[in-house]
């Protein structure tokens, strides 16, 4: 169960200030809360989390136990860096009404984001890819649902940059602690 809860929390934290949530909010504001959009959000969250979980299951069989903890530390550090350096894109001038196009964009955004990297790392570290996948999908889907429901006011109601920077700092501190623990410096 730790894999499920850790994946849920880290995925949700990583998604709050992320591009997929921002894009979802902007599209929802423009399209008027289209129900198809929320279905696409959940579908892409599930598919990308499943891909990350599958990749983690494969990697777990290839790694030594000590390397698994360092992989989690690396995931935390890279995710921290991604959130720190992320620039929000401009709102689409003429967003498409095609749910297929929206699905492709959300899929591309999510397949390489911090939340999926956490699902991958937690699948490797815990040996529970199904639980990590479920947690990642639930955490990501919940944030995308919130972005969808708030629509155009997502950016106005949430201080996204301070949230993103705060979460980045938390992930960096966690990366240092996990790395020191994996190396046996702290116990």
Give each language-model segment a name:
Residues 1-16, 84-111, 134, 138:
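Small-residue-enriched transmembrane helix starts and helix-helix packing motifs
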Residues 2-57, 118-137:
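Juxtamembrane transmembrane-helix termini in multi-pass membrane transport proteins
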Residues 32-88, 146-155:
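Membrane helix-loop-helix hairpins that form the core translocation module of multi-pass transporters
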Residues 44-48, 99-111, 165-177:
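Small-residue-rich segments of transmembrane alpha-helices in multi-pass membrane proteins
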Residues 58-69, 127-136, 158-166, 187:
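Interfacial loop-to-helix junctions that mark the boundaries of transmembrane helices
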Residues 73-95, 174-187:
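Transmembrane helix exit motif
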Residues 108-121, 172-187:
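Hydrophobic alpha-helical transmembrane segments in multi-pass integral membrane proteins
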Residues 149-172:
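Interfacial loop-to-transmembrane junctions
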């Amino acid at each position: 169960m730790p894999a499920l809860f850790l994946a849920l929390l880290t995925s949700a934290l990583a998604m709050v200030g992320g591009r997929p949530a921002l894009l979802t909010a902007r599209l929802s504001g423009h399209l008027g809360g289209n129900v198809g959009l929320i279905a696409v959000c959940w579908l892409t969250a599930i598919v990308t989390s499943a891909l990350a979980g599958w990749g983690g299951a494969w990697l777990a069989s290839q790694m030594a136990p000590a390397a698994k903890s360092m992989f989690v530390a690396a995931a935390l550090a890279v995710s921290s860096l991604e959130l720190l350096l992320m620039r929000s894109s401009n709102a689409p001038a003429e967003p498409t009404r095609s749910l297929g196009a929206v699905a492709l964009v959300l899929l591309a955004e999510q397949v390489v984001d911090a939340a999926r990297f956490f699902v991958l790392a937690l699948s490797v570290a815990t040996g529970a890819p199904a639980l990590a996948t479920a947690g990642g999908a639930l955490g990501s889907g919940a944030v995308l649902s919130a972005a969808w429901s708030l629509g155009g006011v997502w950016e106005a109601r949430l201080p996204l940059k301070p949230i993103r920077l705060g979460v980045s700092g938390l992930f960096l501190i966690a990366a240092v602690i996990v790395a020191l623990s994996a190396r046996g410096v702290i116990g």
